């Protein structure tokens, strides 16, 4: 896009409301934003998308009293990462966990965000096969 500067990592500096420069109808979300050193994580993208959608809806609704320039306020829900089978790490607030419990938490959180019963069923089947064998459906 003309007139938009990106940093060395390709991220675009955005205004506090996720708009770009003086373009109040262009929003950038996710790992493409450079705002307050936010990490390139899915939860930043999801919250940013919801925020941008709310502001766009406010602009299109003539009766809306919402602030069309409301700043994006990111809430860190925590971070999880799988290390290997039955082993993961999680940091939620100031609490740090490792081992089986965060591994099960990771499965639950990621399963909950899958859309559709078919996708969830396939993911659970894949995880169960991986738990009980070295065979993976991805390789079949």
How does the language model describe each region?
Residues 54-138:
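C-terminal, flexible cofactor-proximal segment of oxidoreductases
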Residues 1-50, 54-58:
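FAD-site-proximal beta/loop scaffold in flavoenzymes
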